[in-house]
Amino acid sequence: VSDTGDFRAGDVLSVACPFTPARVERAVTWGCISVRWPWWGIDTGSDFARWNGIVALGVPGSGRSAPEAEAELFRTDPPPERLGAGDICRVGVPPTMVHVTAVDHHDPPLESGWLPRPRLTVSVLRRGLSYREYPDESHLDGTGYSIHPGDGIPFTFELLLRPYASLQPGDEVADAAGRAWRFDGPWDWTAFDGEPAGAGPEWPLVLLTRAGTPCTVEDAEAVAASTASGSHRKTVRDWMSLTRASPTS
């Protein structure tokens, strides 16, 4: 997985960011520690967003922290409780398993108040957290913790699991029970017979179309091979076992 946008809902990733020196602007207050951000510049040309160069990082397990703090990826070294205003620390992301809940592309780039302006937002939650724990009215907007690959923060990503990796959003398939489906993500299946999705498609699957046109023999063989054994239910179970979370729909 790279910064160019090869992310899908359902992906399980290991994400990391090298620890970089930063100045503490405010010690832990109401579950957050505020630091002068070492990666972004202030977007003085923005007409809509203003940013002062400071980022408040959630401190999980800090007692009064909001639920959003539990989703925080960034950590400080030394730990937040040992830091005060004016101290120099290091901030980064140790290798952390996350699952992707949503992917949004921005054209034109998002006016966020900082530079470079984000072209991509990937919402993630750490292992053990499910999107249902962060309702739409929360700061996380029902999806998760937002990162912006390609925005200057030197994230690295390792793809650990991609359910239905042989399929692409928009693919149309037929299942072993004779039902036709549209695939828009591992947890987003639409049956063309209008009936509820129920337990999902019955394996093996036959690829019918890709990008609205008849599929190639090679693509059809890849889908058939990847669904020759196992089941949709097993795919969900394996994903939940790895992430310790619930699917996003």
Label every model-predicted segment.
Residues T4-C17, P80-H99, L167-A174:
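Short coil-to-beta transition motif at edge beta-strands of beta-rich domains
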